[in-house]
């Protein structure tokens, strides 16, 4: 994982700089999401790892699957990745691109796990509180997790706030056992 991130980072940065300079961050985001989905497909994974195919053949097969949904710059990006045998890194490249885009737009992806379904008012209040705390715009995504028993777990980048009953019970059990 760490190695693939290291290999993917320069490609993600290059794609980001190209997209930013062209004013096409959203277009490139969609383009990379598409190519990441194609690269993540199990059949395409077999093609990309097939030893008998040349990198040019792998790249052309990949472009054929995308069926003209890529602009010229996107197709060239795929060709460069194919030449360097890096098409399998597209999911990682797309994820790193999204991180760079979020930094540029001063936004952060926040995942909220809650034991019970949250209504819109609760989500809005939580989003406002997180925006104030993090000094960034927040894209909130909520998930239901009955295992929490009660409360919520907030994940924003490397920040984790565990305000769940399960988390409190785990801390209590740890304190009792030590």
Curated annotation (Swiss-Prot):
Matches recorded under PROSITE patterns: ATPASE_DELTA (PS00389)
Superkingdom assignment: Bacteria
GO molecular function, one term: proton-transporting ATP synthase activity, rotational mechanism
Known partners and oligomeric status: F-type ATPases have 2 components, F(1) - the catalytic core - and F(0) - the membrane proton channel. F(1) has five subunits: alpha(3), beta(3), gamma(1), delta(1), epsilon(1). F(0) has three main subunits: a(1), b(2) and c(10-14). The alpha and beta chains form an alternating ring which encloses part of the gamma chain. F(1) is attached to F(0) by a central stalk formed by the gamma and epsilon chains, while a peripheral stalk is formed by the delta and b chains.
Matching HAMAP family: ATP_synth_delta_bact
Keyword tRNA-binding listed: no
Alphabetical keyword list: ATP synthesis, Cell inner membrane, Cell membrane, CF(1), Hydrogen ion transport, Ion transport, Membrane, Transport
Record's subcellular location: Cell inner membrane
Membrane topology listed for this record: Peripheral membrane protein
Keyword Transport annotated: yes
Signal sequence, start to end: none
Family: Belongs to the ATPase delta chain family.
Cellular component annotations (GO), alphabetically ordered: plasma membrane; proton-transporting ATP synthase complex
NCBIfam families: ATP_synt_delta, PRK05758.2-2
Function per UniProt: F(1)F(0) ATP synthase produces ATP from ADP in the presence of a proton or sodium gradient. F-type ATPases consist of two structural domains, F(1) containing the extramembraneous catalytic core and F(0) containing the membrane proton channel, linked together by a central stalk and a peripheral stalk. During catalysis, ATP synthesis in the catalytic domain of F(1) is coupled via a rotary mechanism of the central stalk subunits to proton translocation. This protein is part of the stalk that links CF(0) to CF(1). It either transmits conformational changes from CF(0) to CF(1) or is implicated in proton conduction.
Protein name: ATP synthase subunit delta
């Amino acid at each position: 994982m760490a190695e693939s991130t290291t290999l993917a980072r320069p490609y993600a940065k290059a794609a980001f700089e190209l997209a930013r300079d062209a004013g096409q961050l959203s277009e490139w985001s969609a383009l990379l999401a598409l190519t990441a989905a194609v690269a993540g497909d199990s059949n395409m994974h077999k093609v990309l790892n097939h030893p008998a195919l040349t990198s040019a053949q792998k790249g052309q097969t990949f472009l054929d699957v995308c069926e003209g949904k890529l602009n010229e710059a996107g197709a060239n990006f795929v060709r460069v990745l194919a030449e360097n045998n890096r098409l399998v890194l597209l999911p990682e490249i797309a994820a790193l691109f999204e991180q760079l885009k979020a930094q540029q737009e001063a936004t952060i992806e926040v995942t909220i796990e809650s034991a019970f379904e949250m209504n819109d008012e609760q989500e809005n209040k939580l989003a406002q509180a997180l925006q104030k705390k993090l000094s960034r715009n927040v894209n909130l995504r909520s998930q239901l997790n009955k295992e929490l028993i009660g409360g919520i777990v907030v994940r924003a980048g490397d920040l984790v706030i565990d305000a769940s009953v399960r988390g409190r019970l785990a801390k209590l059990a740890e304190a009792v056992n030590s």
